[in-house]
């Protein structure tokens, strides 16, 4: 059951695409148009410090997330009550679906995911209406 939750959470948090395609730095402005926003809130497992989690989050973003086609940008925040909010901007929904399969088996994602309390996770996918840069 925990493995299923882990896979689902990995999929939800890391909606991205095949790493063999363009990354954000190579995308034109047209390709960087946000077509989907992923918002995930969660708490960390007991004993995981914010500092430690931030290191895993940065490593996962650098080594995995930023290399995915369709990834535009990410914001990770933490509130006073230790609720984390991960906001990821994607090119389109197709990239999100493609990453579901990829994130299930990525060894680059697992260390990040193991730090998250699965029972606290809430995730939504939304189509943006207004995005101001």
Segment roles from a protein language model:
Residues 35-43, 85:
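Active-site-flanking beta-strand signature of metal-NTP-handling nucleotidyl enzymes
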Residues 66-72, 89-124:
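An amphipathic, aromatic/His-enriched active-site/gating alpha helix that lines ligand/cofactor pockets
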């Amino acid at each position: 059951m925990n493995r299923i939750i882990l896979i689902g959470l990995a999929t939800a948090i890391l909606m991205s695409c095949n790493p063999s395609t363009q990354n954000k730095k190579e995308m034109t402005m047209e390709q960087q148009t946000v077509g989907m926003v992923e918002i995930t809130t969660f708490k960390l497992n007991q004993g995981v410090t914010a500092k430690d989690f931030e290191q895993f989050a940065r490593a996962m973003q650098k080594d995995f997330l930023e290399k995915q086609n369709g990834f535009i940008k990410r914001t990770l925040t933490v509130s006073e009550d230790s609720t984390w909010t991960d906001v990821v901007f994607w090119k389109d929904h197709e990239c999100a679906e493609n990453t579901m399969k990829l994130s299930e088996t990525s060894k680059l994602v697992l260390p990040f995911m193991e730090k998250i309390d699965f029972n606290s996770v809430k995730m939504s996918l939304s189509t943006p209406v207004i995005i101001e840069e």
